[in-house]
Amino acid sequence: MSQGDLPAIHGSEWRASAPLSFTQPLLADAARTEVLRFIAQRHDGHLFLVANVWDVLIENEPAQFEGESWHTFTTRFIEAVHRGLQAQIQAKMGQDEGVEVIPRRTMDVFLDRRAQHFLVDLRLTFRRLAHYMAVGIGQRLEWQRTMTRTRKLDAHLKTIYADGMATPDGGSFGGKGFRSTWQEGVVAVATALRRQPDASRDAVPGKGYDGDLVAPMIRDIGLGLAMGDTPLDVMAANLGKAGSNQNGGWDGAGGRDLHVGAWHVGVLPPTAPLPIASVTMTGLAFAAWRQNLDRFHVACIGEGTSSSGEFWEAMNLAGARGLPICYILQNNQIALDTPPAKQSGVEVWADKAVAMGFPAWTIDGSDPAAWHASAAVAREFAMEGGGPTLIHVETMRGCGHAHHHDDLYLGNASGTPPGYVDRDLLAYWEAKDPIPTHRQLLLDLGVDEIALKNMEEEEQLLVDKALKTVTEMPWPDPETVTKGVTTLNDAETHKQRFDRLKTPYEGSEAPAPLAVGETTLDYVESGGWTYARAIQQAMADIATRHGDQCVFIGEDMEVAGAFGMNMALKNAGHADKLVDMPLCEAVIVHTGTGAALSGMRPMVEIQFGGFAALGYNALINNAAMLRWRWGADCPMTIRIPLGAKTRSGPFHANMIESWFANDPGMVVIAPGCPQDAYDLLMEAAELNDPVIMLEHIGLYGLGGGLTGWGQNINQKVDTSPVQTAIDEGKRHKIGKAAVIRGGRDITLVTWGSMIHIAKQAADVLSSEDIEVEIIDLRTLLPFDAQTCIESVSRTGRLVILQEGQWNGGLGHTLQSRILESSFYSLEAAPVVIGAIDTPVPFSPPLEDFTVPSLDHVIEVVRFSAQS
């Protein structure tokens, strides 16, 4: 691709492959109305052209169409419209065709591209009408059944909320839920998809489940049910009972999240930061695109959440890459308490797709067949290379945001509160309630009233049975909540923490791993690898090991990557695994998360530490929680270059390890030397957890092979031990701290760039007969407390050295945990050394002043050792 290329118009070559079989004729007048309705919505400037072409061509057509005749007619119609567009341009533009509309884009090129988008929209409109007319009575009966199930389930959930269920502490709890009132038509989306409702409970996409994937909104219970979720699972999740599938992958450990979902049948559980589901589904679509999977993706979102930046980032990526996904944007007339007119200035919500370069249209949400036909054409288009689409659904939420919100929104029968809902709007949509209106349509189509009543009774029995079962279902054992934070660790209980305080620690008896003055941190003058080279080689070896499962995504990846870190991948023949992403960290991380859920092993790069703030929601509220919430593997590595002594100033050099200390679920590593950089990155790529690798730019060796401190830290890296451990399914270094210098008088705990300052300080102090034992944590979260405790119990003193700012730094958390088990071994007050509490400055003298210097470290350690 050339730098000056224009964006691809995905779907411009798409054509409906074959006629569909209509279940009833399509009246020509009705078809004309539907087509002109769409043109008025999306391309009003072409309204008269389309109407005129229709009126000319229809003269030789019958009054109604069957599938074959409709297919033939629409093909001729689009060709005629195209000719009409060309004729208009030739007649009106003349010599102006070559004029630049914008720099490097002439009038003829500009208008031709506009025409291509218009013709794609026309083809989709005609095909959508064909899918609508192909709907059969069997599909309609399924929709009616699932809508009925949804409404009856919602009624039970509201009753449970109001009445509550007895909890073990003698209280009452009714859970929380989001009803679907008047939005049940979404169930019809599922009949347009490839489903596998009988997949085993342990299935995941690609392993036992091979259907399409959906990301419902929090109130799209019906879509989940239509895919294969059950009323019992929905109730258990909304109540937080032990049998909920929000169990971290542990039987009987449910209740961790109130949101529903059924990943084993392709239903992605939503999250409270609502755009997360749609962006994650975009990541899953990205994985399908990369892996050439025959899989379609549906992401539902409300008009309120469509204001979020992450939703725009998702659409932007999908449009740029032509991903196989459909976004369903439901305007239900209120986002909690904020009306649509205060959310956006778009004329219709479908306009939001225009800026992203892909098709969109609007439907009436009270018509299940419109949902089905739209999803069907979106799937057909995407699966044949057309790319993404957006379906704007006009509907209304006939209830409060959640059960507790009904009175505020609709009003209480007592009149207090009175409710603020627009009564005219409410009456309009109540008259369009899809369940009774579609039921009447079924009767008009000849379905027997008794058959419908029998179905409704069956659905009532089904949800009644689920209610009985969930009532008898136990509440989760409280201690199960600690299970499965990461594959490396569970959480401690309060009792375990207290027992630790009560139990004297005998760690002073633990033998020292190194003799006093002995070190494992060796450098070489020649023949060694820089820190950067070790990381580069690890990436190349990971790509070789995992093949097409591996993908490297981030900003500016395909040319060389930041600091040229991707050149080794290209030189090793892995250029095809490098993917440039739009400049938005959130969608980069969410995409990696989706790819990981699809079975890939993505390696994500955030270019600088400060930029990670833009991806924080994606890291903390999405990737970090997946295992603990519902037991999902998320084998994703996130590389974040950062650190001082690079003269890169604020935003780039931030040390951010403390950001993640209070949000469990991620493994955080911070290698300080080439050998550990290679080993830890290799191991990170094997974990089924999100792993953040904080790699210090100042250690890369960009200054002629020297660090930002002017040191040579090059090492001869032995790649065999970690590869052997991986092959044998064993842990090598990850999760384990290392004593890198034996000492006697004081323990110095550190990580990353500071291990080299620590070693220099120890060498100086050794000449003063002060022997410092240095511990390199290597893995920060979860950290190896035991190695630190054993050392402090031997030396009696503790200093923690961090490059990051002192206030709120990770060192204080580490210190607290170490001292709980070694306090009575102390002979002096523990100390944390950190940077001064300012952002990282740009100017060399300022930056050098803020970061802990060698002289300062020597001074503090000497004082502590002599105290």
Name what the model sees in each region.
Residues 2-192, 207, 396-573, 826-867:
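Conserved acidic/glycine
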Residues 167-172, 256-271, 295-298, 356-359, ...:
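Glycine/charged-rich beta-loop-alpha catalytic/anionic-binding loops adjacent to active sites
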Residues 188, 265-333, 363-381, 558-633, ...:
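Thiamine diphosphate
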Residues 218-223, 241, 301-307, 329-335, ...:
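Acidic, glycine-rich active-site loops and adjacent beta-strand->loop/helix elements
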Residues 243-261, 349-350, 559-572, 721-730:
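Acidic-glycine-rich active-site phosphate/pyrophosphate-binding loop
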Residues 421, 806, 815-831:
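Catalytic-face loop-and-helix region of soluble metabolic enzyme cores
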